[in-house]
Design a protein with these regions (language model features):
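Divalent metal-coordination and catalytic microenvironments
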Residues: 58, 88, 115, 130, ...
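Alpha-helix C-terminal capping segments
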Residues: 100-105, 133, 322-324
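Non-cysteine beta-strand/loop elements that form the S-adenosyl-L-methionine
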Residues: 57-59, 170, 329-335
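Acidic/His- and Gly-rich active-site-bordering loop/insert found
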Residues: 1-84, 89, 93-96, 100-110, ...
Length: 442
């Protein structure tokens, strides 16, 4: 019974029933999705004021895709036109398995685990909605896993650096002059112009971006024309852009705008980049979190379980969490040709090797335990400053001041990054509005 983004009502209820059976408390801050809490019972799990000494967020997305399943499996979707073709049902299963493990190990949990069953990943809204409810308040790190059809079953890949791409959406409108299909010289063919723009856009990737930097511009829609014997007067294109590089991501709208407008002008028509929307920022694993995850894989699966994957230009809104706290996205491999588990994500034939689910659950549980067992920065710094204070109070005061300044600097850097992204979007919107006004004045 898969359900589309923001309509995951039965899915949410099913998850709630499982949590009830495990006696794990949860809240429903949104119409769909929920947030559970697992409290550690280690002696140092909570401070005297009742706050956890350390808190980690584990996230599983829960929505499906508008795809009609054709796997023929007995458990195939019964909801016409809706399928878990990206494996989010597996993410739910792995997370519930992780909780089954952890609820019997609370004495080993030196803090608190916040589990987010997130709606609406596929349309890029869910993470922002959940974060808006405060799920990242007091969180020190985040973890998520994505089953992946290009990684061998039984292995987990969690390398550092970019793992999933900046994901943007665009629309281009073309205006020509319609005329009789037998008299093309009397008009300007918007469909032909649109086709030229499709080809011209590819020169951005091949000639303006380093060949060592991954980038993709895909036109997924081209619509134009009203009749077979009429030269089309209008057409529009829609598609997606995927990038890793920050500079490329920032410059892409202007690169596309130049190509679009000049290509159309050369053919006697007009074209405009009427929409350019940032859907998701790239998912980037920090080095410390990646190494912690690698160690969890080795502990649970041994050396044979360590997978290696280059990353993908697919997008994921888990990036919204990682823009705010350190963390890791792990790829849990599902590829197994022996059982036909080779189809890519989003295919109507998509299936997985289900034996990997328990392994994914174990790695997530181990990661959470290891993360919470690590000393906090306060614990690392506190004794040192206290010891200094016994012999040199002035120096101790300076150390405390420096620590506070460093914390302020980290906050300022985060605020600056957020402001930069907002400014880029503002520039794009302002330019689009100005061009719209110019066209209207003409």
């Amino acid at each position: 019974h898969p359900e589309l983004s923001l309509a995951e009502e039965r899915t949410t209820s099913d998850i709630a029933n499982q949590l009830d059976a495990m006696n794990i408390p949860y809240e429903r801050p949104l119409k769909t999705g929920l947030v559970a809490t697992l409290r550690g019972t280690a002696p140092d799990a909570y401070r005297e004021d009742g706050t956890p000494r350390r808190r980690i967020l584990l996230r599983a997305d829960i929505d499906a895709l508008p795809v009609t399943e054709q796997t023929g499996e007995e458990f195939a979707s019964v909801n016409e036109g809706c399928m878990h073709a990206c494996g989010h049902d597996c993410h739910i299963a792995m997370m519930l398995g992780t909780l089954q493990i952890l609820r019997h190990m609370t004495d080993d949990i030196h803090g608190e685990i916040r589990i987010v069953f997130q709606p609406s990943e596929e349309n890029g809204q869910g993470a922002k909605l959940m974060i808006g409810t405060g799920v990242l308040d007091g969180v020190d790190g985040a973890y998520a896993a994505h089953i992946w059809s290009e990684v061998d079953a039984g292995t987990v890949s969690c390398e550092p650096g970019p793992r999933m791409a900046n994901t943007d959406w665009f629309r281009i409108d073309v205006r020509g002059t319609s005329c009789h299909g037998a008299m093309p010289q009397r008009g300007h063919d918007a469909v032909m112009v649109a086709a030229e723009i499709v080809n011209a856009l590819q020169t951005i990737v091949s000639r303006e971006i380093s060949p060592y930097e991954p980038a993709v511009i895909t036109v997924g829609e081209l619509h134009g024309g009203t009749a077979r014997n009429v030269i089309a007067g209008t057409a529009y294109l829609a598609g997606t852009v995927r990038t890793y590089g920050d500079k490329t991501h920032e410059e892409m709208p202007e690169l596309m705008r130049r190509i679009v407008e000049h290509t159309a002008a050369a053919l006697g028509a007009e074209a405009e980049l009427t929409d350019y929307t940032i859907a998701n920022y790239k998912v980037e694993n920090d080095a410390a979190s990646s190494e912690r995850c690698r160690q969890a894989v080795l502990k649970c699966l041994g050396p044979a379980g360590e997978g290696h994957y280059r990353g993908t230009l697919s997008g994921e809104d888990f990036s919204e969490y990682l823009r705010r706290v350190p963390g890791v996205l792990a790829f849990v491999g599902t590829r197994n040709p022996q059982i036909g588990a080779t189809y890519a994500q989003h295919s109507c034939f998509y299936k997985i090797d289900e034996s990997v689910l328990a392994k994914g659950s174990m790695v997530a549980a181990q990661y959470a335990i290891d993360f919470l067992a690590e000393p906090t920065q306060e614990e690392l710094d506190g004794p040192t400053i206290a010891a200094v204070a016994e012999t040199n109070p002035d120096l101790a005061a300076k150390l405390r001041s420096a620590k506070a300044t460093a914390a302020e600097a980290r906050d300022a850097m985060h605020d600056a990054r957020t402001a930069r992204h907002a400014a880029i979007k503002g520039i794009h919107d302002a330019r689009a509005a100005a061009r719209h006004e110019e066209k209207r004045d003409e």
